Amino acid sequence: MKRLIIFDMDGTLYSLNAVLPAVYEIQIDFLNLKKGWSREKIEAYFNDNCVFPFVSEKSRSATALFQSEGLDAKEWNDFREARFPFDAVVPSPTVSKELMDDFDKLGSCVLVTSNSRKNAQRILDKIGINVASFDSIVCDDTTSFNRPFCKKDIFEKLLCDYSMRPHQSFSIGDRYSTDIKPLLELGGNGVLVAAPESLSGVVGDMSNGKLMTCDAYRYFPSEGITSESLWG
């Protein structure tokens, strides 16, 4: 059976624990520069919009938030690229080319991230994953969609581009609202991972047709889809 497997990057392919506090400061600095808001106002605004300095499955994209404020996407990408804490990006010992090859055997693999292409490339290099591991990569500065950055729109186009029915698609990510819910709304499947180390269990269970909710990940099946139609 054909499958479309869509990966998030930050928090999914590598841990954000050491990266997120520094990225949060970059986001504060950018909004202070563009809006002139105080730190207290920015922190309250971020909290109201689920942009946090810590890992949370409720987190949402600061990039999409900035674009909804009318801030220039390229200016934000340039600002972030110049300050991103690449030294804090730590590869997971279980996320490897071999792991991605195992996913590739199950279907077409696509990376969707609100990072710029340059940032995404540097992060993938740091964690030892080749861009060739993905059939395509969609970044904030490579998508032609209207702003703000919207994963649901991107997922819908990917289903069309790869000639997939929704139940043949799987979104794998660490944030429910941003990575999982948009594809569920289109009729697809979601796999919410607890950490990058969860991916080895996901690919094993997908290979055996036994995705489930467990300590490592939570599986959100396409509504009304049977195991026979998913794995037959």
Where is each model-derived feature located?
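Conserved phosphate-coupling serine/threonine residues in phosphotransfer and NTP-handling enzymes
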Residues: 113-115
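Short active-site oxyanion
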Residues: 107-111, 167-169
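N-terminal helical cap/lid subdomain that shapes the substrate entry/recognition surface
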Residues: 2-98, 102, 118
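Short acidic-hydrophobic, aromatic-tinged amphipathic segments that line or gate anion-handling sites
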Residues: 207-222, 226
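Acidic, Mg2+-coordinating phosphoryl-transfer loop and its flanking beta/alpha structural elements
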Residues: 172-209
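Anion (oxyanion) recognition and catalysis
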Residues: 103-104, 184
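Substrate-recognition "cap/lid" segment bordering the active-site pocket of phosphatases
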Residues: 117-170, 186
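Glycine-rich, phosphate-binding/catalytic loops in enzymes
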Residues: 21-25, 127-129, 187-190
